[in-house]
Amino acid sequence: MIGETKLAQDFWELGRCPECPIYDMHGHMGVWHSIYFPRADTADMIRTMDECGVRMLLFSHHMALFAPDLGNTLAVEAVRRYPDRLRAYCAVNPNYPELLDADLAALDADPHHPLIPDVYLGLKFLADYHGIALSDERYRPAWQYADEHELLVLAHTWGGSPFDGPSVVRAMAEAYPRVKLLLGHSCHGEWDAAVQLARDFANIYLELTAVFDDRGVLEKLVREAGSDRLLFGTDLPWFDPHQAIGALLSAEISDEDRHNICHRNAERLLAPFLGMSGV
């Protein structure tokens, strides 16, 4: 189905819509082993964002996911270079507890140049890749810090995973109610469980990276969880925003739903950090 609403027509004709800015809440940056990304460096990613009206990207650097002492530094540099377009998640790898402690300490180290909110708006967990469940004690310092400071946590989640599947997510949402918990990929494949989590916890949001690939799932999430609990995301540079935007515009949902997903929900989450003035 080709979207024919006013909002869709603006995007088809102009490539973007000033009345509907897009906040991409799930991105990365930099090269990755065994795959070619045509636009993986910071400047090229900004160019991609410009082409399709992405106002801001929240990302974790690829290197930070496995070498946080190096990659988080690269994330800081990128945000300092484009402060109006980028914010980062501080990547947490519980396999290196000494680095985790150092990263958390650095967030508060310099009150004159605070990393929150000038660079970071939250933490990034990648439990499936790190082989350590979100509920593991080694994650506790990060969860506690995020809960105390009411930060965003973007957690990779996947259906059937013993590390970050729905049952593990539920336990963490119960334990840390002040965290704004963004479920990366929306517990991919276990859509009913993802819907139930969004219904049961006011602090849970379903992030849509890779959801757009499954026909009918977006409509299901809008219908059963509500568009006010969904967030636009792409995994840029893994997926091009144009594909996700096209799927969103062609889905059988309303323009009000699209506004919620593209910017309203993100603006509400980001407002305590950024005030949304000039963002």
Regions from the language model: what does each represent?
Residues M1-M25, R39-M56, S227-R229, H242-V279:
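Mid-to-C-terminal alpha-helical segments outside catalytic/metal-binding sites
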Residues D41-T48, G71-A78, A102-P114, R138-A142, ...:
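A general structural detector for well-ordered alpha-helical segments in enzyme core domains, enriched
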Residues H26, M49, A75, L123, ...:
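Conserved, mostly hydrophobic/aromatic
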Residues H28-A40:
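Acidic/histidine-rich helix-loop elements
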Residues I22-G27, L57-F59, R87-C90, L121-F125, ...:
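Hydrophobic faces of well-ordered beta-strands that scaffold small-molecule active sites
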Residues R55-M56, F66-L154, G160, D200:
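Active-site gating/metal-coordination segments in enzymes
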Residues G3, S135-L231:
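Catalytic pocket-lining loop regions of alpha/beta-barrel enzymes
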Residues G30-H33, A64-A67, P94-E98, G160-G165, ...:
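Active-site environment of divalent metal-dependent phosphoester hydrolases
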